[in-house]
Amino acid sequence: MGDKYIGLAKKSDDITSAIELVKKVFDENNKKENFIFPQESLKLKNIVIVKIDDNIVATCLIHNRLLYFKGKKIPSAFLCFICVDKKMRGKGISKELMNFTIKICKKNKVELSFVIARKAVDYYYSKFSFFGFSNYPKILIKTSPKPTKTGLIFLKLKNSLINEIMDIYNNTHEKLIGAFHRDFINWKFIIKKGKTKGVNLNIIKDNDSTIGYICFKGVDIYEIALNEKKYYPLVLNKFLMDEKVNRINLHMGINHPVSKNLDNFDYTFSFRKCWYGGHMIRLNYNKEKFKILLNKKIQNNILTDEIFNIPLLDQL
């Protein structure tokens, strides 16, 4: 093996080569997938590379976020697009890549690191003190819509409208353990990602006043946040009417405000947990602070201490 460098990207060519490697590794079947990357992750300080003889053979992108946890914003990071060139596997390179990436996170005072792991590699990340905390809460609504006249309208969410919903989103999600704070830049990326996933992001207005937003695909609603609880049944009923359906899958749990405003609906809660992988987390500092995570398997009141599942459009 030739000269080796393990560290942060140093020049723009490193960024280009790292992206090319990601596309090569993650699109092995040549499906021409539409890869999108948060701009913040494409900075030199957020790209870890392994070079051998000046060729990048492994990389990991760091995407910094703020996690809501017990009313506080916790410095966190997604470790994403982790990959090693197929020709260089089995040589210990992935271990070096992960160890250096974790070192950078700790140096930057990142308290929690996340990976969204493919099932085939769940076991691997556990070697670096990651553990699974995947939750899949769902509220199934089976109700025929009730014809009602309201001033509610759904409009496509555009960058120019982001400021109208940022506070509504954050005020709702700051109380949900596991949700992430979103600023304008985060929202711009989420709108872009939604398009690639075929997910609809709509701002909701009551006459001329913005009351919140909704994120959905088919009958699956992945996110909803409204500025007043009275609007939840009205918005859900409008969704049923507009989509001409009699059921909705709400991908959220009992701690979300929508769950307290379903009196006029036939609904069922379901709650699936997956401890071995999927959404995985590493506690870099202050483990005492995160007892709710460390003791996840033995909680007596597990629904009260529910960890909110990472929203689809925040996953990287």
Stretches found by the model and what they are:
Residues 1-64, 71-78, 146-184, 219, ...:
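Short amphipathic alpha-helix that is part of the acyltransferase structural core
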Residues 84, 90-103, 228-241:
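Conserved acetyl-CoA-binding loop-helix of GNAT-fold acetyltransferases
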Residues 47-49, 114, 201-203:
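Residue-level detector of beta-strand face positions
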Residues 131-225, 229-230:
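Amide-forming acyltransferase catalytic core, primarily the GNAT-like/NAT-type
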Residues 98, 103-117, 243-254:
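Conserved GNAT acetyl-CoA-binding A-motif
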Residues 65, 82, 118-121, 130:
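An acidic- and aromatic-residue-enriched active-site/binding cleft used to recognize and process polar
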Residues 122-148, 222-316:
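Active-site/acyl-donor-binding loops of N-acyltransferases
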